[in-house]
Amino acid sequence: MTKQKTISFCIIGRPNSGKSTLLNRIIGEKLSIVTPKVQTTRSIITGIITLKDTQVILYDTPGIFEPKGTLEKAMVRCAWSSLHSADLVMLIIDSLKPFDDVMHDILDKLRSLNIVPIFLLNKIDIESKYLDDIKAFLTENHPDSLLFPISALSGKNIDGLLEYITGKAKISPWLYAEDDITDLPMRFIAAEITREQLFFNLQQELPYKLTVQTEKWEVLKDKSIKINQVIVVSRESYKTIILGKNGSKIKEIGAKSRMQMERFFGFPVHLFLFVKVRELWENNQEFYQYMKI
């Protein structure tokens, strides 16, 4: 009988560097939400893939940046906390952008924690004027770290990365069933799907000023699911924008969210969205517990 092996790794880095895209690419499912806007991921998203005798557990994390408000600070703390749960730490680097102070701060903190990260130089499928300089800097200043040039979007060199990761796995019973892709509750995933559509369909800063909670999940006789969700905002004016003229905006968001849920869960969904105003919700620990940060 083949002995089971397990290994875990976390993916950290700046916002929009490709962390969520990489998780989705590796597990082969759209689990972690991805938008063109920064700071989309708010909590640790656990992905699972079982390759032959090895189970790989990976943690997508919020982007690391210079936080200002209470929510932003909680997100960054959440990202750093993931390091304690993983066997390997992957620092994903956007090769289309120059190194800045935040990147240097990340490297300094990793060094202070005695962590030798694996560098994932992402977006190499696009020509970059910074690529050679980044490689030279990392090679000279971090000779003990491995460097994998990859493209999370196209999948370039991902097989080689996975071969390295599985080669580091140790004999240990799997923590999850062979076909599991996450340990996140379906209610949480459904809320994330709606939050993604809010990012795509609302302008400017409004998506950062809200949260989504799944309040009801009911399996009906025909095996379809009735889902009630609440979009929580801090101002009445935000509620007006989300609702749109005659409710047109929230209907559009609801329709797109429902389609994504049906695609992910594999069963019909009846989705009902509501908007509630809770002033200063960002200061309420109840919401942070729900968001898992």
Curated annotation (Swiss-Prot):
Q: Where is it found, in Gene Ontology cellular component terms?
A: cytosol; plasma membrane
Region (G5) residue ranges read 150-152
Question: Mind telling me which InterPro entries this protein's record contains?
Answer: G_ERA_dom, GTP-bd, GTPase_Era-like, KH_dom-like_a/b, KH_dom_type_2, KH_sf_prok-type, P-loop_NTPase, Small_GTP-bd
Q: Membrane topology type, per the record?
A: Peripheral membrane protein
Entries under Pfam families matching the protein: KH_2, MMR_HSR1
User: Where is this gene product found?
Assistant: Cytoplasm; Cell inner membrane
Annotated ranges, domain KH type-2? 202-279
Residues binding GTP are 13-20, 60-64, 122-125
One GO MF term, please?
small ribosomal subunit rRNA binding
Q: What is its main location?
A: cytoplasm
Q: Where is this region: G3?
A: 60-63
* Record-level GO BP terms: ribosomal small subunit assembly
Please list where the region (G2) is annotated.
39-43
Q: How does it assemble?
A: Monomer.
The protein's job, in short, is: An essential GTPase that binds both GDP and GTP, with rapid nucleotide exchange. Plays a role in 16S rRNA processing and 30S ribosomal subunit biogenesis and possibly also in cell cycle regulation and energy metabolism.
What is the designated name of this protein? GTPase Era
Question: Where does this protein come from, organism-wise?
Answer: Rickettsia felis (strain ATCC VR-1525 / URRWXCal2)
